[in-house]
UniProtKB/Swiss-Prot annotation:
Description of how the protein assembles with itself and partners: Forms oligomers.
Membrane topology: Multi-pass membrane protein
GO cellular component, one term: plasma membrane
Record gene name: best-15
Function in brief: Forms chloride channels.
Name of the featured protein: Bestrophin homolog 15
Main location: membrane
Subcellular location: Cell membrane
Annotated Pfam families: Bestrophin (PF01062)
Disulfide bonds: none
Organism from which the protein derives: Caenorhabditis elegans
InterPro entries for the chain: Bestrophin, Bestrophin-like
Any one Gene Ontology molecular-function term assigned to this protein's record: chloride channel activity
Keywords, in A-Z order: Cell membrane, Chloride, Chloride channel, Ion channel, Ion transport, Membrane, Transmembrane, Transmembrane helix, Transport
């Protein structure tokens, strides 16, 4: 009984809106027409009594106006939008959960057809009965939850007559002793028992495959259990009661509050016949929107019922049985022969119809993929991220950035040559980094502890074996280790720390300086 209207709203246009509003089956007009008609008659009746001098006098009308003003001022104390908003949200969530757990047998049927191999009658019966028992369990659950399925299968004999269950299976089901409790689990147990028999007979190649089929069957049972739980425990009765009562009480008070016409709390100086029509029309529109909103919740609160938009439970049972048996039996082992496809050794270029070939496509491209990052320099410098420079202890050489973690990436430009490192501008990021470091009070101490450039050339030209401890003590700043003595540090480690302290903020050397150092090394050698 589901109403399909997706074709009418395939495009956003005024005609789609009109086609949607003119539908009758499952529409708000069908749900609302009777109550709207009753409200209009009641409103006109009360309005006639209020404006008739024969029924009420002028003094009584004044009292009416006072009550109407009080009602109109205090009607907003009923939080209709708040109550309906939460109520409809809960109803829609339950509706979605029920729909997601109706139960579909395709996954189980495909697994059964692929894992239970064989074309003999015994194997075919096992495959068919596994699916039929699953649908039988669904019939038993739907029969107790859906009134439309209950009308289709009023007795257990009707299930046998419909072919979902055989006579000896009905006797076996009746012999199961579980008191007054439901026997939904019995067909599921039959299905899993057939899997064990098929594995024992060698029709299932491995235990892993049998377990895979069993997982699908158990998952199907979980869906039916959740469906039964939703039917067993509905929304607490007080919630729909208070919502439905609040909506109808609101419009009952509106019958009195919307009769008198007051402009800024006073009667209009020049009465007109059009004045009473304004509250009448606005009350009707409010009734359509608010009560229609409530009707949406009423129609969705039990989607397994008999409303126009409730689920097609009978169709689902028939479909699961026919599709499942077709997969495991009629379409078993009917795979087409493997041949070369139409795009073999060719570019894959699917075709379109003439009407759709010229429609532009929007391919999946990242939103930042076409952003052109402008780089003014010939090379990009890469360095590790420094979360907070202020936390660095510049008196410790362990916190200095090692030069090997920096990288220079050349920018390939179509025109022009690569500039030398000496003429290249420093990156703004490093300028900001130097500026922050320069603000620290440690900078003066760092420069005082640095050795001269000539000493640096000397250490770089000497072999590690020629550097003795006395030379290091003369040139390098004296620092105490954890034991307070410099002699506990080896020569190579001290030379590495000295080089790091000499150039704490120099990122890289230019090409001319590198050549000069190379010449000095060769001359000293």
């Amino acid at each position: 009984m589901t109403v399909n209207y997706n074709l009418d709203v395939s495009s956003a246009s005024i005609f789609s809106f009109l086609r949607l509003q003119l539908r009758w089956k499952g529409s708000i007009w069908k749900y609302l027409l009777k109550e709207l008609f009753m409200f209009i008659i009641a409103f006109i009746t009360v309005s006639s009594v209020y404006r008739s001098n024969l029924i009420i006098g002028e003094k009584t009308r004044k009292i009416w106006d006072n009550f109407a003003a009080l009602f109109d001022q205090n009607m907003d104390f009923i939080p209709l939008t708040f109550m309906l908003g939460f109520f409809v949200t809960i109803i829609v969530r339950r509706w979605n959960d029920i729909f997601a757990n109706l139960g579909w047998v395709e996954n189980t049927a495909i697994t059964v057809a692929n894992y239970i191999r064989g074309t003999d009658d015994r194997t075919r019966m096992i495959r068919r009965n596994v699916i039929r028992y699953m649908v039988l369990a669904q019939v038993l659950v739907f029969r107790d939850c859906s009134i439309q399925v209950r009308k289709r299968f009023p007795t257990m004999e009707s299930i046998v007559s419909a072919g979902f269950m055989l006579e000896h299976e009905k006797e076996a089901l009746d012999n199961v002793q579980c008191g007054k409790l439901q026997k939904y689990f019995v067909p599921i147990q039959w299905s899993t028992g057939l899997l064990v028999d098929a594995r024992a007979e060698g029709k299932i190649a491995a235990d892993l495959l049998m377990n895979e089929i069993g997982k699908h069957i158990i998952e199907f049972r979980k869906m039916l259990a959740l469906l039964s739980n939703y039917d067993w425990v509905p929304i607490p009765l007080a919630y729909p009661q208070v919502v439905f009562l609040a909506v109808r009480s609101y419009f009952f008070m509106a019958l009195i509050a919307r009769q008198s016409v007051l402009l800024d709390g006073k009667e209009p100086e020049q009465p007109s016949i059009l004045y009473p029509t304004v509250p009448f029309v606005m009350s009707i529109l409010q009734f359509i929107f608010v009560v229609g909103w409530m009707k949406v919740a009423e129609s969705m609160i039990n989607p397994l019922g008999e409303d126009d938009d409730d689920f097609e439970c009978n169709y689902l049972l028939d479909r699961n049985l026919m599709i499942g048996l077709c997969i495991v039996d009629d379409n078993y082992n009917r795979t087409p022969s493997v041949e070369k496809d139409a795009f073999w050794c060719a570019d894959v270029e699917p075709l379109y119809s003439v009407e759709t070939a010229m429609i532009p496509k929007n391919p999946q491209i990242g939103s930042a993929a076409n952003y052109d990052v402008k780089v003014d320099e010939e090379e990009v410098m890469m360095m590790p991220h420094m979360d907070d420079v202020d936390l660095f202890d510049f008196e410790s050489t362990n916190n200095l950035i090692p030069r090997k973690t920096f990288s220079v990436i050349s920018i390939q430009r179509p025109f022009g040559s690569r500039a030398s490192l000496a003429s290249r501008k420093r990156s703004m990021m490093f300028d900001q980094l130097r500026g922050r470091i320069a603000k620290k009070q440690h900078r003066s101490n760092m420069f005082q502890n640095s050795v001269s450039q000539a000493s640096l050339h000397y250490f770089e030209s000497q072999a590690p074996s020629e550097i003795n401890l006395s030379t290091l003590e003369m040139t390098a700043p004296k620092r105490k280790s954890s034991t307070g003595k410099l002699g506990s540090m080896n020569v190579a480690e001290e030379q590495h720390k000295l080089s790091a302290e000499v150039l704490p903020i120099v990122i890289e050397e230019d090409e001319e300086r590198s050549k000069m150092l190379e010449k000095d090394k060769n001359k000293n050698a």
